[in-house]
Amino acid sequence: MDSNTVSSFQVDCFLWHVRKQVVDQKLGDAPFLDRLRRDQKSLRGRGSTLGLNIEAATHVGKQIVERILKEESDEALKMTMASTPASRYLTDMTIEELSRDWFMLMPKQKVEGPLCIRIDQAIMDKNIMLKANFSVIFDRLETLILLRAFTEEGAIVGEISPLPSLPGHTIEDVKNAIGVLIGGLEWNDNTVRVSKTLQRFAWGSSNENGRPPLTPKQKRKMARTARSKVRRDKMAD
Protein backbone atom coordinates (compact mmCIF):
# COMPACT_ATOMS: atom_id res chain seq x y z
CA MET A 1 0.00 0.00 0.00
CA ASP A 2 1.37 3.42 -0.97
CA SER A 3 2.42 5.45 2.10
CA ASN A 4 1.07 8.68 0.59
CA THR A 5 -2.35 7.07 0.21
CA VAL A 6 -2.35 6.15 3.89
CA SER A 7 -1.12 9.54 5.12
CA SER A 8 -3.66 11.34 2.91
CA PHE A 9 -6.44 9.27 4.45
CA GLN A 10 -5.15 9.94 7.97
CA VAL A 11 -5.04 13.70 7.42
CA ASP A 12 -8.51 13.68 5.82
CA CYS A 13 -9.87 11.83 8.88
CA PHE A 14 -8.43 14.42 11.27
CA LEU A 15 -9.63 17.37 9.20
CA TRP A 16 -13.12 15.81 9.11
CA HIS A 17 -12.97 15.59 12.92
CA VAL A 18 -12.07 19.30 13.13
CA ARG A 19 -14.95 20.22 10.81
CA LYS A 20 -17.30 18.09 12.94
CA GLN A 21 -16.30 20.15 15.98
CA VAL A 22 -17.18 23.31 14.04
CA VAL A 23 -20.66 21.91 13.35
CA ASP A 24 -21.10 20.78 16.97
CA GLN A 25 -20.44 24.36 18.06
CA LYS A 26 -23.07 25.56 15.56
CA LEU A 27 -20.53 27.50 13.48
CA GLY A 28 -21.15 25.76 10.13
CA ASP A 29 -23.71 26.75 7.49
CA ALA A 30 -25.86 24.39 5.39
CA PRO A 31 -23.31 23.76 2.59
CA PHE A 32 -20.63 23.09 5.23
CA LEU A 33 -22.88 20.52 6.93
CA ASP A 34 -23.77 18.96 3.57
CA ARG A 35 -20.12 18.44 2.65
CA LEU A 36 -19.42 17.03 6.12
CA ARG A 37 -22.09 14.34 5.68
CA ARG A 38 -20.92 13.43 2.19
CA ASP A 39 -17.27 13.27 3.25
CA GLN A 40 -18.16 11.01 6.18
CA LYS A 41 -19.54 8.41 3.75
CA SER A 42 -16.46 8.80 1.56
CA LEU A 43 -14.09 8.27 4.50
CA ARG A 44 -15.95 5.14 5.59
CA GLY A 45 -15.63 3.74 2.08
CA ARG A 46 -11.94 4.60 1.85
CA GLY A 47 -11.29 3.15 5.30
CA SER A 48 -12.95 -0.11 4.29
CA THR A 49 -10.98 -0.24 1.03
CA LEU A 50 -7.66 0.47 2.76
CA GLY A 51 -8.42 -1.72 5.76
CA LEU A 52 -7.72 1.16 8.18
CA ASN A 53 -9.51 2.11 11.39
CA ILE A 54 -10.88 5.66 11.17
CA GLU A 55 -10.33 6.48 14.87
CA ALA A 56 -6.69 5.37 14.76
CA ALA A 57 -6.17 7.18 11.46
CA THR A 58 -7.60 10.37 12.99
CA HIS A 59 -5.00 10.33 15.79
CA VAL A 60 -2.13 9.84 13.34
CA GLY A 61 -3.57 12.54 11.08
CA LYS A 62 -3.59 14.93 14.04
CA GLN A 63 0.12 14.30 14.60
CA ILE A 64 0.89 14.94 10.92
CA VAL A 65 -1.04 18.22 10.88
CA GLU A 66 0.49 19.40 14.17
CA ARG A 67 3.99 18.71 12.84
CA ILE A 68 3.29 20.66 9.65
CA LEU A 69 1.80 23.61 11.53
CA LYS A 70 4.77 23.70 13.88
CA GLU A 71 7.15 23.99 10.93
CA GLU A 72 4.97 26.45 8.99
CA SER A 73 5.71 30.15 9.35
CA ASP A 74 2.90 32.71 9.40
CA GLU A 75 4.32 34.38 6.29
CA ALA A 76 4.38 31.12 4.33
CA LEU A 77 0.79 30.44 5.40
CA LYS A 78 -0.31 33.86 4.14
CA MET A 79 1.39 33.28 0.77
CA THR A 80 -0.22 29.84 0.43
CA MET A 81 -3.69 31.19 1.17
CA ALA A 82 -3.24 34.08 -1.28
CA SER A 83 -2.15 31.78 -4.12
CA THR A 84 -4.83 29.13 -3.62
CA PRO A 85 -8.03 29.67 -5.64
CA ALA A 86 -11.21 29.40 -3.62
CA SER A 87 -14.02 27.11 -4.73
CA ARG A 88 -17.69 28.05 -4.51
CA TYR A 89 -20.58 25.83 -3.48
CA LEU A 90 -23.71 26.03 -5.65
CA THR A 91 -27.11 24.58 -4.76
CA ASP A 92 -29.97 23.70 -7.08
CA MET A 93 -31.57 21.65 -4.31
CA THR A 94 -32.83 22.67 -0.91
CA ILE A 95 -31.62 20.82 2.20
CA GLU A 96 -34.97 18.97 2.23
CA GLU A 97 -34.58 17.86 -1.40
CA LEU A 98 -30.98 16.88 -0.77
CA SER A 99 -31.62 14.77 2.33
CA ARG A 100 -35.02 13.27 1.43
CA ASP A 101 -35.21 9.46 1.30
CA TRP A 102 -36.73 7.91 -1.82
CA PHE A 103 -37.41 4.46 -3.23
CA MET A 104 -37.74 2.96 -6.71
CA LEU A 105 -40.57 0.77 -7.99
CA MET A 106 -38.37 -0.67 -10.76
CA PRO A 107 -34.79 0.05 -9.69
CA LYS A 108 -31.84 0.13 -12.04
CA GLN A 109 -28.33 0.95 -10.92
CA LYS A 110 -25.20 1.49 -13.00
CA VAL A 111 -21.66 2.51 -12.13
CA GLU A 112 -20.09 4.98 -14.55
CA GLY A 113 -16.46 5.54 -13.53
CA PRO A 114 -16.40 6.83 -9.93
CA LEU A 115 -20.12 7.73 -10.01
CA CYS A 116 -23.22 5.66 -9.21
CA ILE A 117 -26.38 6.19 -11.30
CA ARG A 118 -29.79 5.09 -10.01
CA ILE A 119 -32.98 5.23 -12.09
CA ASP A 120 -36.59 4.28 -11.41
CA GLN A 121 -37.60 2.54 -14.65
CA ALA A 122 -41.28 2.63 -13.67
CA ILE A 123 -41.50 6.36 -14.47
CA MET A 124 -43.10 7.12 -17.86
CA ASP A 125 -44.32 10.20 -19.79
CA LYS A 126 -43.14 12.72 -17.19
CA ASN A 127 -41.42 16.10 -17.38
CA ILE A 128 -38.23 15.74 -15.38
CA MET A 129 -35.70 18.31 -14.16
CA LEU A 130 -32.14 17.44 -13.14
CA LYS A 131 -30.86 19.45 -10.17
CA ALA A 132 -27.45 19.24 -8.51
CA ASN A 133 -25.40 20.56 -5.62
CA PHE A 134 -21.73 20.93 -6.50
CA SER A 135 -18.60 23.01 -6.03
CA VAL A 136 -17.14 25.28 -8.71
CA ILE A 137 -13.62 26.55 -9.30
CA PHE A 138 -12.46 28.75 -12.19
CA ASP A 139 -16.13 28.84 -13.31
CA ARG A 140 -16.14 25.07 -13.97
CA LEU A 141 -17.73 22.22 -12.04
CA GLU A 142 -15.16 20.89 -9.57
CA THR A 143 -16.90 18.27 -7.41
CA LEU A 144 -20.40 16.83 -7.66
CA ILE A 145 -22.00 16.43 -4.24
CA LEU A 146 -25.31 14.97 -5.45
CA LEU A 147 -27.55 15.14 -8.51
CA ARG A 148 -31.22 14.17 -8.47
CA ALA A 149 -33.99 13.93 -11.05
CA PHE A 150 -37.34 15.44 -10.05
CA THR A 151 -40.77 15.19 -11.66
CA GLU A 152 -43.01 18.28 -11.82
CA GLU A 153 -44.79 16.91 -8.75
CA GLY A 154 -41.51 16.87 -6.82
CA ALA A 155 -40.95 13.10 -6.77
CA ILE A 156 -37.35 11.88 -7.01
CA VAL A 157 -36.93 9.40 -9.88
CA GLY A 158 -33.17 9.30 -10.45
CA GLU A 159 -29.86 10.11 -8.83
CA ILE A 160 -26.12 10.43 -9.48
CA SER A 161 -23.78 10.27 -6.49
CA PRO A 162 -20.02 9.80 -6.00
CA LEU A 163 -18.92 6.32 -4.93
CA PRO A 164 -17.44 6.48 -1.41
CA SER A 165 -14.89 3.80 -2.32
CA LEU A 166 -13.66 5.74 -5.39
CA PRO A 167 -13.09 9.35 -4.29
CA GLY A 168 -12.38 11.95 -6.93
CA HIS A 169 -14.03 12.50 -10.30
CA THR A 170 -13.63 14.79 -13.29
CA ILE A 171 -16.08 17.07 -15.03
CA GLU A 172 -16.13 14.58 -17.92
CA ASP A 173 -17.14 11.79 -15.52
CA VAL A 174 -20.09 13.92 -14.42
CA LYS A 175 -21.17 14.80 -17.97
CA ASN A 176 -20.96 11.15 -19.06
CA ALA A 177 -23.05 10.06 -16.06
CA ILE A 178 -25.66 12.73 -16.82
CA GLY A 179 -25.83 11.45 -20.40
CA VAL A 180 -26.49 7.93 -19.11
CA LEU A 181 -29.18 9.18 -16.72
CA ILE A 182 -30.91 11.19 -19.45
CA GLY A 183 -30.83 8.23 -21.82
CA GLY A 184 -32.31 5.93 -19.19
CA LEU A 185 -35.15 8.32 -18.38
CA GLU A 186 -35.93 9.14 -22.02
CA TRP A 187 -36.20 5.42 -22.81
CA ASN A 188 -39.66 5.55 -21.19
CA ASP A 189 -40.75 8.69 -23.10
CA ASN A 190 -39.90 11.10 -20.30
CA THR A 191 -38.84 14.65 -21.20
CA VAL A 192 -35.65 15.57 -19.36
CA ARG A 193 -34.20 19.03 -18.75
CA VAL A 194 -31.04 20.08 -16.93
CA SER A 195 -30.97 23.09 -14.61
CA LYS A 196 -29.37 26.22 -16.10
CA THR A 197 -26.84 26.37 -13.27
CA LEU A 198 -25.62 22.84 -13.98
CA GLN A 199 -25.55 23.47 -17.74
CA ARG A 200 -23.49 26.61 -17.30
CA PHE A 201 -20.78 25.18 -15.07
CA ALA A 202 -20.60 21.68 -16.61
CA TRP A 203 -20.92 22.59 -20.30
CA GLY A 204 -20.08 26.28 -20.26
CA SER A 205 -23.44 27.31 -21.74
CA SER A 206 -27.16 26.96 -21.14
CA ASN A 207 -29.87 26.13 -23.66
CA GLU A 208 -33.47 27.26 -23.35
CA ASN A 209 -34.68 23.70 -23.97
CA GLY A 210 -32.67 22.53 -20.97
CA ARG A 211 -30.62 20.05 -22.98
CA PRO A 212 -26.82 20.01 -22.73
CA PRO A 213 -24.72 19.24 -25.83
CA LEU A 214 -24.33 15.51 -26.42
CA THR A 215 -21.00 13.83 -27.13
CA PRO A 216 -20.67 11.84 -30.41
CA LYS A 217 -20.83 8.61 -28.37
CA GLN A 218 -24.08 9.71 -26.70
CA LYS A 219 -25.57 10.74 -30.06
CA ARG A 220 -24.80 7.30 -31.55
CA LYS A 221 -26.27 5.56 -28.51
CA MET A 222 -29.47 7.64 -28.67
CA ALA A 223 -29.78 6.93 -32.40
CA ARG A 224 -29.53 3.17 -31.74
CA THR A 225 -32.10 3.50 -28.97
CA ALA A 226 -34.50 5.35 -31.28
CA ARG A 227 -34.15 2.72 -34.03
CA SER A 228 -34.75 -0.06 -31.52
CA LYS A 229 -37.88 1.70 -30.21
CA VAL A 230 -39.24 2.12 -33.74
CA ARG A 231 -38.77 -1.60 -34.43
CA ARG A 232 -40.58 -2.51 -31.19
CA ASP A 233 -43.48 -0.20 -32.05
CA LYS A 234 -43.81 -1.77 -35.50
CA MET A 235 -43.83 -5.28 -34.02
CA ALA A 236 -46.52 -4.22 -31.55
CA ASP A 237 -48.70 -2.93 -34.42
Curated annotation (Swiss-Prot):
UniProt KW Nucleus keyword? no
A GO molecular function annotation here is: protein serine/threonine kinase inhibitor activity
Q: Main localisation, per the record?
A: host cell
PTM text: Upon interferon induction, ISGylated via host HERC5; this results in the impairment of NS1 interaction with RNA targets due to its inability to form homodimers and to interact with host EIF2AK2/PKR.
Q: Where is this region: Disordered?
A: 205-237
- GO biological process assignments: symbiont-mediated suppression of host cytoplasmic pattern recognition receptor signaling pathway via inhibition of RIG-I activity; symbiont-mediated suppression of host gene expression; symbiont-mediated suppression of host mRNA processing; symbiont-mediated suppression of host PKR/eIFalpha signaling; symbiont-mediated suppression of host type I interferon-mediated signaling pathway
Region of interest (CPSF4-binding), residue spans: 180-215
Q: Where is the composition biased (Basic residues)?
A: 217-237
User: What are the annotated GO cellular component locations?
Assistant: host cell cytoplasm; host cell nucleus
Q: Does the keyword Metal-binding apply?
A: no
RNA-binding and homodimerization as annotated region, ranges: 1-73
Q: Where on this chain is Nuclear localization signal (motif)?
A: 34-38
Kindly give the Pfam families that the UniProt entry links to this protein: Flu_NS1 (PF00600)
> Which keywords does this Swiss-Prot/TrEMBL entry list?
Eukaryotic host gene expression shutoff by virus, Host cytoplasm, Host gene expression shutoff by virus, Host mRNA suppression by virus, Host nucleus, Host-virus interaction, Inhibition of host innate immune response by virus, Inhibition of host interferon signaling pathway by virus, Inhibition of host PKR by virus, Inhibition of host pre-mRNA processing by virus, Inhibition of host RIG-I by virus, Inhibition of host RLR pathway by virus, Interferon antiviral system evasion, RNA-binding, Ubl conjugation, Viral immunoevasion
* Localisation: Host nucleus; Host cytoplasm
Q: Where is this motif: Nuclear export signal?
A: 137-146
Q: How does it assemble?
A: Homodimer. Interacts with host TRIM25 (via coiled coil); this interaction specifically inhibits TRIM25 multimerization and TRIM25-mediated RIGI CARD ubiquitination. Interacts with human EIF2AK2/PKR, CPSF4, IVNS1ABP and PABPN1.
Question: What note about domains is in the entry?
Answer: The dsRNA-binding region is required for suppression of RNA silencing.
Family, per entry: Belongs to the influenza A viruses NS1 family.
Entry function:
Inhibits post-transcriptional processing of cellular pre-mRNA, by binding and inhibiting two cellular proteins that are required for the 3'-end processing of cellular pre-mRNAs: the 30 kDa cleavage and polyadenylation specificity factor/CPSF4 and the poly(A)-binding protein 2/PABPN1. In turn, unprocessed 3' end pre-mRNAs accumulate in the host nucleus and are no longer exported to the cytoplasm. Cellular protein synthesis is thereby shut off very early after virus infection.
The family database entries (HAMAP family) matched by this protein are listed as: INFV_NS1
Q: What name is this protein filed under?
A: Non-structural protein 1
